[in-house]
Amino acid sequence: MDLIFSLETWVLLAASLVLLYLYGTSTHGLFKKMGIPGPTPLPFIGTILEYRKGIWDFDIECRKKYGKMWGLFDGRQPLMVITDPDMIKTVLVKECYSVFTNRRSFGPVGFMKKAVSISEDEDWKRVRTLLSPTFTSGKLKEMLPIIAQYGDVLVKNLRQEAEKGKPVDLKEIFGAYSMDVITGTSFGVNIDSLRNPQDPFVKNVRRLLKFSFFDPLLLSITLFPFLTPIFEALHISMFPKDVMDFLKTSVEKIKDDRLKDKQKRRVDFLQLMINSQNSKEIDSHKALDDIEVVAQSIIILFAGYETTSSTLSFIMHLLATHPDVQQKLQEEIDTLLPNKELATYDTLVKMEYLDMVVNETLRLYPIAGRLERVCKKDVDINGTFIPKGTIVMMPTYALHRDPQHWTEPDEFRPERFSKKNKDNINPYIYHPFGAGPRNCLGMRFALMNIKLALVRLMQNFSFKLCKETQVPLKLGKQGLLQPEKPIVLKVVSRDGIIRGA
């Protein structure tokens, strides 16, 4: 009897292991059947281990090895990688509303599923439509003075660091500027975060912004997607609960205070959303509810912080390694804004070389190194069958450095984006902010923010290499596109007279 029971136990165990193995590999034959090449997936984990060498270099390696299209697996989830610009246009633009509306879900996010970057289908369309007027050029012009005051704080803080006579860690300085601008424009909160690191807002926001593709919760959901509804039922979220509660309470309090005080308020994103709630032109059932206002404020913070701080850091490294470009940029700024005049929205638009420098930096270092869309139904795109549930991924970083599309792609050449040349650039090869109806809603705000800071910096400082500067710059292996080591440069005052200090 014991022997029989023992045998049954072993058979049951063996059957369980076989079923478990089949579950862990059931999707892994998809691309092989379709004749699409790619690295060999491992049970359960797929091709995730390949990311250990760095996601961005891995994408470039795959482009060289497999050609225009290849297949990957994040756990059991198939990713079809496409690089053909016509196919990318179909996914991002032509079939956006019908098939490729949504981004990938990264698991339980609580009320943040209402945020414009995360929401899906009709919910996304409604929120996007309501938010779009917030990012018009007219609204950005009104918001520019808010950002300008933080540009003065940036100059003051950088001057104080430079006067210590030591090389400056740029991410710390630009991270503080970025946080000040985003908290000021999305929450209406004034903070000099570099000088007030213990401020509750600063501490909570910094916790929110810590992110890694190798986070245990994210990995568990990638390997076992069926855990998502269980985590949601247990109120476990990708975002720290205490941080989200703090931000939710803060926004609600700020909103209540503003509604009680009838005085004219400055134009910021929070106020514009409050105004839209009370607009007679919007049906009450379509307007943003209070929790949606909170979600949008937080997602603006989450998306805007890294874009600004990292891009400014990359720009300064490139300018320090290309002093001729830095000098030419300073000359353009000095000509259009003599005597350190403050930039206006219209002046920023006129600065052609400034635009070229920023665009070329975003080519080399696009903050979103990949774009993804989920296929909602079986579809044939340009002769390629894409099954329902497949994630279609466009490797932006690899496309931006593809020698088939760029001469000497690893070289920093702002002239690529001159008036004469930029019309030759395919918008479905170069897309640092995405493309189509679901591109980055805050693109113009981000560019204005970056350019305004860059003008203030170039008016007052020159940036030079020092022994601590990593040359050539290497990228880290975490999820976001960031340098391997902090970017450290020598900062020199141009004339000792620093406006705003």
UniProtKB/Swiss-Prot annotation:
Its cofactor is heme. Induction: By rifampicin. One of its GO terms (cellular component) is endoplasmic reticulum membrane. Keywords: Endoplasmic reticulum, Heme, Iron, Membrane, Metal-binding, Microsome, Monooxygenase, Oxidoreductase. It is found in: Endoplasmic reticulum membrane; Microsome membrane. Exhibits progesterone 6 beta-hydroxylase activity. This is Cytochrome P450 3A6. The gene is CYP3A6. It is a peripheral membrane protein. The keyword Heme applies. InterPro entries: Cyt_P450, Cyt_P450_CS, Cyt_P450_E_CYP3A, Cyt_P450_E_grp-II, Cyt_P450_sf, Cytochrome_P450_3A. Its EC number is 1.14.14.1.
